[in-house]
Amino acid sequence: MTICFTDGMEDFLDKVYANTSDDTRDLYAKWSTSYDQEVGGNGYATPARAAKALASHVTNLNRPVLDYGCGTGLSGIALRAVGFSTLHGIDVSKEMVAIAEEKKAYQTLRVFDPEVDPPVKIGEFDTIAAIGVIGIGAAPLPVFDKIIALLTPGGLFA
């Protein structure tokens, strides 16, 4: 396993499971240039698996999808591969978003602060993907309420 920090696995995990939004942003800013290579090299299959599962529950793959915590765009690539055509991504890391822009998978990409309301309208999306996002240090559980509020009534969150 390649680690983006030279100070060992324990310190790396402490950074991944950071306590503040600033800590999380700092981690992903540093990790952005090696993230795809590192997670790909470790067999990270979550984006492809989640995209396939999500597509099996959506009747219109042309409707807009919000990729909440889009990172470098790995999930956007996976969502496109299963047929989703209209993707919008938001993430806390401007460095990760810059890499996602290079992949050309999204109609729009925005950087946001998870401690304030996301830069999209409430009820704007039928489908929201937060692939590999919810967890301590990434998007803590209180973020759920903010994400769910963005869905149309009866919308799908994965």
Predicted regions and their residues:
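Conserved SAM-binding loop and adjacent beta-strand
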Residues: 36-51
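Glycine-rich helix-loop-beta junction characteristic of Rossmann-like nucleotide cofactor-binding loops
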Residues: 53-60
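Short conserved AdoMet
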Residues: 59, 101, 138, 152
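A short SAM/SAH-binding and catalytic strip from SAM-dependent methyltransferases
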Residues: 126-140
